[in-house]
Design a protein with these regions (language model features):
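Conserved ABC ATPase "signature" region
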Residues: 99, 103, 110-128
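Conserved ABC transporter NBD signature motif
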Residues: 59-70, 75
């Protein structure tokens, strides 16, 4: 059985008296991972620890079954990193930089040239490969950063805020590119404070707040699947009482209900209650809990 993508054991990281990460525990499976939390939550610090850039103050972490402190070089050979801010040399061409990056990973020069060409084509920069980074748009620079992160064919790529500063078209392009990595067998960890980006690109979610993990689960388990939303015409109190009497979970806002029931056909249950109460119905249909809803609920805690 393959090892988890990431394993954390009592992991903490401090800067002087400031605790950036506090006692993180958990395993993250292989796949497309979303690391989500507000700015300052500890996402970038966690990535730097997982890359072996920062040594943990306490505890341990493994990436692809390798210790980030004891097997750092071997681990780094199997991962890629797209930083939040690029620092790409403005006077260098994309082709030259990608060849250099491939050679740093131990790829011979001739193979590095071919690999650089292939990866630039993949990210849509083949026509711009001989242009200098100083002439690139923000979207092109982001794609170049992604290219350097995968030029050595890693098993896992860390993407720190990969959609930052992009316009809607650029965001769509980056979503597509991140999605394509899965078809090449590359696992991804996408760090973002934009919840819709995580919903679009990931199948597992790690929520972090104040340096602590508050949720670590499959995305579909986090968003909670489908409930039924119904708007009645009158007598909402009677409808709520009838639904609760049948064991349904009910959230009501005026005439609008979100109803979750263990019944095989929730629509039939709701329709029966509406008929018995004579409340009438304006509309009824599926209601999907978004990742943003789940995150806000997790922040508030149980009511």
């Amino acid at each position: 059985m393959s090892s988890p993508l990431i394993e954390l054991k009592e992991l903490s990281q401090s800067y002087g008296n400031f605790v950036a990460l506090s006692g993180l525990n958990g395993t993250v499976p292989r796949g497309s991972i979303g690391l989500v939390g507000p700015n300052g939550a500890g996402k970038s610090t966690l990535i730097k620890v997982l890359l072996g850039i920062l040594k943990p103050s306490e505890g341990s972490a493994e990436v692809l079954g390798l210790s980030v402190t004891e097997d750092t070089i071997a681990m780094r050979a199997r991962v890629g990193y797209m930083p939040e801010r690029g620092g790409l040399p403005p006077d260098q061409t994309a082709a030259d930089f990608l060849i250099y990056a491939a050679e740093l990973a131990g790829i011979p020069h001739k193979a590095a040239k071919q690999r650089a060409s292939d990866v630039l084509t993949l990210v849509g920069l083949h026509e711009e490969r001989f242009r200098h980074f100083g002439d690139f748009s923000t979207g092109m620079l982001q794609r170049a950063l992604l290219a350097q992160a995968i030029v050595h064919d890693p098993e896992l790529v860390f993407l720190d805020e990969p959609l930052a500063g992009l316009d809607p078209e650029g965001r769509d392009e980056m979503h597509h590119l991140i999605g394509r990595l899965k078809s090449f067998g590359i696992h991804t960890l996408v760090s973002s404070h934009m919840l819709p980006d995580i919903e679009t690109t990931c199948d597992w979610i790690v929520m972090i707040e104040g340096g602590r993990i508050i949720r670590n689960s499959a995305l579909h388990a986090t968003t909670g699947g489908e409930t039924v939303q119904v708007e009645v015409l009158q007598d909402p109190e009677l409808v709520e009482a009838g639904l609760r009497a049948l064991g349904a979970e009910v959230k009501r806002d005026g005439l609008l209900f979100d109803v979750t029931t263990s019944e095989e056909d929730p629509y039939e249950t709701i329709t029966r209650v509406l008929a018995e109460t004579g409340a009438g119905m304006r509309r009824m249909g599926p209601s999907v809990t978004t990742l943003e809803d789940a995150y806000l609920s997790q922040e508030r805690g149980p009511e």
